[in-house]
């Protein structure tokens, strides 16, 4: 079985800082259009001056990465290697303690800050990692910084993965962990967050909890996600996971992505695609994306749906950076993004 080297919602591997190779510019900027409105675009996009020098160097380094084809086993091996490296980096920047355990029969990591105010001891955040639903790209990479900055315990959930376990297996696992935590925590003292696949799961879990009549958590963190598996947002036709660099493959209604996760579920099922669910009464939500994020459009569309349902939903869009850039701790923009995430939970959870 072959899949793309960087499937949708996978983490971006950290690359060394390299000078971008000089290539000849296209003869001229142009755009032509088919009768149905399909655009064929050639553009010259200079390195943005509106981001930090560190981010400029990082964007340049992404042009040196090579894609290609990988088997699922190869992808998981590569992602595991990245996760180990990224977790070590996370601890350097944001020290925290990590304990491996199980919760409701599901493997979890308990991440605790080195110091925790007494007022925060009743709070807990559930982290749902990214990785394209078929691997773990960021369990500790996501959970460690938030535990450190929010001075709050984080439970990172190793939910079952596709293709072996398609939807709704991952949702079932997270709900089981949430119900277990309800035995020791009030729902108002629990928050749920995730990046990419984990962001999608966060919204799906909230819908499941509402449909099941369970108490909802205090807050949701949806960091580069989507709410609709039946359609493709505009940014997915413009960007790869690295922004501009990388292989682009056209997506249309006949070859929608993520079949292995979706399985036999109707793509418009509200439990799978929260955009079709009743979102009234959903918890306060923070959504974070960036202007070269492959899921920029999908994140913005979900944000609008939450607003239309009267939800306290905030959208933060960072300039010129690609998908899940906050996995890369050398960037000042990452520090800002993580601090905003932690501040949001500090305001909403257990208060």
Where are these regions (language model features)?
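Phosphate-/polyanion-interacting regions in eukaryotic proteins
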Residues: 64-85
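An N-cap/entry alpha-helix motif that binds or orients negatively charged groups
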Residues: 80-98
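Alpha/beta-hydrolase superfamily serine-hydrolase fold, recognizing
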Residues: 22-36, 42-70, 92-351
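Positively charged n-region of N-terminal signal peptides that target proteins for export
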Residues: 1-5
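Bacterial N-terminal signal peptides
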Residues: 7-17
């Amino acid at each position: 079985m072959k899949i793309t080297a960087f499937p949708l919602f996978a983490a971006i591997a950290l690359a060394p800082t390299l000078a971008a190779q000089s290539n000849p510019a296209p003869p001229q900027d142009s755009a032509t259009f088919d009768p149905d409105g399909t655009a064929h675009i050639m553009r010259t996009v200079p390195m943005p001056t509106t981001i930090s020098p560190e981010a400029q160097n990082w964007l340049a380094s992404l042009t040196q990465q090579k894609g290609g084809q990988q088997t699922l086993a190869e992808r998981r091996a590569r992602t595991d290697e990245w996760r180990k490296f990224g977790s070590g980096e996370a601890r350097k920047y944001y020290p925290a303690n990590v304990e491996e355990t199980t919760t409701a029969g599901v493997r979890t990591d308990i991440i605790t800050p080195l110091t925790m105010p007494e007022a925060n001891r009743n709070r807990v955040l559930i982290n749902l990692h990214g990785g394209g639903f078929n691997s773990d790209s960021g369990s500790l990479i996501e959970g460690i910084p938030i535990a450190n900055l929010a001075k709050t315990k984080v439970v990172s959930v190793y939910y079952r993965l596709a293709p072996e376990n398609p939807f709704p297996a991952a949702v079932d696992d997270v709900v089981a962990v949430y119900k277990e935590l309800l035995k020791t925590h009030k729902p108002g003292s629990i928050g749920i967050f995730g990046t990419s696949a984990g962001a999608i799961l966060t919204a799906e879990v909230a819908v499941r909890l509402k449909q099941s009549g369970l108490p909802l958590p205090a807050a949701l963190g949806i960091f580069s996600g989507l709410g609709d598996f039946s359609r493709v947002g505009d940014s997915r036709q413009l960007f790869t996971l690295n922004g501009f660099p990388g292989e682009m493959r056209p997506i249309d209604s006949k070859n929608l992505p993520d079949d292995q996760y979706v399985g036999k579920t109707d793509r418009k099922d509200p439990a799978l695609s929260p955009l079709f669910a009743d979102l009234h009464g959903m918890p306060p939500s923070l959504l974070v994306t960036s202007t070269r994020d492959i899921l920029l459009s999908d994140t913005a569309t979900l944000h609008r749906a939450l607003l239309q349902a009267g939800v306290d939903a905030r959208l933060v869009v960072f300039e010129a950076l690609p998908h899940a850039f906050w996995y890369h701790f050398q960037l000042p923009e990452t520090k800002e993004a993580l601090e905003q995430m932690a501040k949001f939970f500090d305001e909403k959870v257990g208060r």
